[in-house]
Each structure stands twice: as C-alpha cells, then as structure tokens.
C-alpha cells in the first residue's frame, strides 16, 4: 500500500522532497505502530509533540493525513498542533553582515559564491529556485517559475546585478545554460550551497546561525520593505499564496528590537 501511495504522490504537483518525507513518515508509523487506528495515531502524535518542533510535527501529520485520504480513512485524520508565532524574526543576516560577506567573497576571488549570495539577496529566490537560473535569464532580466498550483511567479533580476553578472559570464566564457556549477561542470546542489555557506561563515568569523540560504531571502524581503513599503507587491515577488505570510517581514529581528530598546528606554 505504501508503494501505491508513493506512486500516487508522484503524480501530484508535490516537490520530490515532500513526497519522500510523506512516504518516510507513513513507513515509520506502520513499522512502529502497526495498525492504523485512532489510538495509534494519537500515540504517534504524542511522540512527535514530545520530540520535535511544531513545524516538524505538522509536516509529519500532513504526511499521515495524506495517507489517510488515499486509503479512504478521512475520519481518522489527525489535527495539527498550533504553532505559536514569535513576535520577532529569528536568525536573519543583517544588511551589514550581508555586505561584509559579499565584499570578502569578491576580494578573495570567490566570484561564483559572490554572485550566489548577491542573487539570493537581490531576487528573493529560494535556494532551489536559484539553481534554475541560466545565462539566458541574465540577458532577458527575469526567470519564470511554476509553482505547485500551476501558477507562474516571475523572478526579476535587478539591472545592476544583470550588468555585473553578464560581465562575469563573459569572462568565464559561459554563454548559455545554468550559471551556478560545481567543479565538475554540473549544477551545484542545495546541500553544496548550505555546506559552503557554513565554511565561509567560519572563514570570515561570522555567526553561522545567520549564514544559510534562506537567510538571504529574508534579507531581500526586509530590505525591500525598508526601501519600498508595498506588502502586496512583496508577497507577489516572494511567491506567497497569502499576504499574511509576508506580514512577518514587518516585524523586527530580535537584535533590531534590542537595539531599539537600548536606544529608547533610558528611564
């Protein structure tokens, strides 16, 4: 049945990693709890709540619920846990640190990584989306991405980045195809980017907690709102289904909150 479930998911618009996660979850549940019934499902939920963060718990429960839908057992579906939203953004690279990292990468001749960081912070691209950028997209100034629901999201490449990236591509003789490649000439992986970011954070004495791929997407959103306060437009640029998701960028980071309190509160 799990194999049939996997084949069913593969025909949907779910990302490959999501399919893998759902199948792994169902297999784990069946191996450890056996029969699918309310008692076992609640026991599994209890195990998740005790051992994982709410977001992870809900991801696992989503996989279980998808399986219950597939096996026509919707009545057994498990409720998600409530995720307490923090009133500040966590682990977002500061604008100063972003500029510092860019400058160091440029000075040390890490041109490809200089552009990886710049592209992420200047386009708001997810790391998986970044890998789809080709030389042809630099020429036209944008990349069209297709979301799970079949919607098109346009990733715009700002003029100053286009100009410098085009110059770099001419220097390395790359006229077409994917621009971010590993030493074997193959597309770099998301894991490779994450690993290299950790290396650079250590090399330049930066906080590893803020030097990770999604941090630069957060920085794009924060910088955009600081300079052009249009939440609806930002939601479109980020590819958010709901503007409520984008509202988090109206919040300050924890360090920003601390600085404001230190400056304002003198009584």
Model-derived segments and spans:
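Conserved catalytic core of the tyrosine transesterase superfamily
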Residues: 1-267
